[in-house]
Amino acid sequence: MVTSVRTQPPVIMPGMQTEIKTQATNLAANLSAVRESATATLSGEIKGQQLEDFPALIKQASLDALFKCGKDAEALKEVFTNSNNVAGKKAIMEFAGLFRSALNATSDSPEAKTLLMKVGAEYTAQIIKDGLKEKSAFGPWLPETKKAEAKLENLEKQLLDIIKNNTGGELSKLSTNLVMQEVMPYIASCIEHNFGCTLDPLTRSSLTQLVDKAAAKAVEALDMCHQKLTQEQGTSVGREARHLEMQTLIPLLLRNVFAQIPADKLPDPKIPEPAAGPVPDGGKKAEPTGINININIDSSNHSVDNSKHINNSRSHVDNSQRHIDNSNHDNSRKTIDNSRTFIDNSQRHGESHHSTNSSNVSHSHSRVDSTTHQTETAHSASTGTIDHGIAGKIDVTAHATAEAVTNSSSESKDGKVVTSEKGTTGETTSFDEVDGVTSKSIIGKPLQATVHGVDDNKQQSQTAEIVNVKPLASQLAGVENVKIDTLQSDSTVITGNKAGTTDNDNSQTDKTGPFSGLKFKQNSFLSTVPSVTNMHSIHFNAREAFLGVIRKALEPDASTPFPVRRAFDGLRGEILPNDTIKSAALKAQCSDIDKHPELKAKMETLKEVITHHPQKEKLAEIALQFAREAGLTRQKGETDYVLSNVLDGLIGDGSWRAGPAYESYLNKPGVDRVITTVDGLHMQR
């Protein structure tokens, strides 16, 4: 967008020169009726450069016009600006919008204009007197402001009467005049500013055709609804003000039109003339200096022997000083050349070329002694932690300080590489310095390892088992007791597709059938259990309330793997929907469950999950409470397949079907003394 420097000859916009013989909308017809005087009337008071600014500008102009009628315009602005009464400010803005339109409509009648100014003066006096405080007559109705509101209603009625007397009873002329005298001139000025041109009279008179036809039809439909509503319910300041406010949105309809104009149809922008004076380089402008980024990718092959080795890092470490290659092959991993990892006197050589702009990093090689069950990572004493650019992935051996908690062997075989990667949390592995003299580091966060087999430079994923890494006390010399406890509880290496759990995981075991690794939030359902008093008043909704508790209890924990959590959430939402209509529909569908084998299989799966819930005993107690206090088991399992499966999962012996412990107190002796009150059911004394 280039703004013109000097006045340009008129530009005829394409598609705007032909005379419009048929009008698509009433809005276009209203404008065409005054087309002969279009050139003279298209000179509105509102000036701006952006189409979307028009509604705010017209509101500000309306407030200014109203406040000018008062004795102190600045005081009125201060009262209005500092007020927190939203409803009162909205009422004043509606009155101001209609008042300004009435001033334009009565410009030819001095008497009507005098009456308007009098109404405006009285209205502004009420604003000063009221102060637009919390209890304001301009806001919602209050008994304290009844007299002041009666005065405001009288002023609004006078304003409408003045408009009707000067428009022949046709209030629609206000919107037509607003569009013709304010909206279209504003659109013309925005076009001239944005395109750097001057519109000729014919183009200015055809601005209506720029408005999107579909949007214009919507405006026309709203006009018809407004007229019909006025005929049925009469006129009011608020209704008329909102109708005028709708017309101020017309400029917004042009934003998409401007974006769809082809580039070859736009007028050539005016190029500013060069400033006077000598121009260096023969008048040629110096081109801006660009930034060149050269990326060299080395596609050389890595040679890997078949000796036993474990590389638990994307970065390979050796004893000598080595280089970090700033270019990477997959845009996400940094490689280090000339690396060697020693495990059981076997070594692996990986060589790669690097670019000239690589940086140097010094570290000591990682060594593992399987006989002492210790894992140490020695590094230079100048650094307390490994740089996060290559950290997060460290070298750990297959026999490193690991206690196998499974029955399968976790020994590494020939031609296998164990690669440790960050967990799903995306956190970088941290290293805590143990001894500043020996510069030893220990693993401080959980790591996840994946086994890969190496065969002719090809890697194949292998399954592995769960191992717990617990540092020995000899490794933790000089570390505080708090840090020791944290490391011993958190150091877990997950190397397979089983769900690994820590020692303090509340015994959530992998017994959830197809949802391996599923964990639930602890005690999250307690907030949904109603009190005993409330249970007495939900006898007709006991089923939904109880299933809501079960649905909350089955909410997966954030530590559950995302694919498992997503799959189980889908099953939970289908069988236990959080919608009474869907729940009733599912109950009706389950009335003939034999015709829906897939649904029956899903119910059995959910029942199995409930059976192995770690807090099943607590949920069974809640079910017993619902049965006694809310009459839950009055709805027998024969008539509610979903409820019966949930109760069977919690209470495996089926005692809830006929046991007296699961009967509501309403079905026991003395039920004839139960009375219904406002706050529920009570026993007569």
Curated annotation (Swiss-Prot):
It is found in: Secreted. GO terms for cellular component: extracellular region. Residues 369-385 have a biased composition (Polar residues). Residues 291-304, 417-429 have a biased composition (Low complexity). Keywords: Actin-binding, Secreted, Virulence. Belongs to the SipA/IpaA family. This is Cell invasion protein SipA. The gene is sipA.
